[in-house]
Amino acid sequence: MRTAALSTMSTILSVDPLSFPFATDSPFLFGVHHDDRYPKGNAKMGPDASLRGHSIGADFGNPAGWSMYHGEGGVPGFPQHPHRGFETITVTVRGFIDHADSLGAAGRFGDGDVQWMTAGAGISHAEM
């Protein structure tokens, strides 16, 4: 019965171009979109390309089609940092992302995987 009811209405409310950050109806929602085309990696798990033009530690300018973000030691991503009281949803279209947190949980997700993370007080995590 529920399936029949859903099939008679559209769940898509609108289609809009991407903006940064995503416009939302709620002040409690913050949406961002990263579409990086990272170059081949090197033996240290960093990009095998020049970092010239990249502002290490705060690189969001997307020079050459990719950014280091808050990456340290030549590895792009978001090193250990805390959150409290919100959730993040990460969809990996291509490539891989390594997650680790201060509770000892760790994992790798990629190529179509989705990560839904609920942030708790006193817990730090990293996505690299």
Enumerate the language-model features and the residues they cover.
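N-terminal, Lys/Arg-enriched amphipathic/low-complexity engagement segments
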Residues: 2-91
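A generic local secondary-structure boundary/capping motif
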Residues: 19-21, 105, 128
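Short loop/turn segments at secondary-structure transitions that flank enzyme active sites
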Residues: 38, 95, 123
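Ligand-binding loop in jelly-roll beta-barrel domains
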Residues: 120-128
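A short beta-strand-loop-beta hairpin characteristic of the jelly-roll/cupin
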Residues: 75, 91-111, 120
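Histidine-centered active-site/metal-ligand motif
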Residues: 81-83, 99, 125
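Walker A (P-loop) ATP-phosphate-binding motif of ABC ATPase nucleotide-binding domains
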Residues: 114
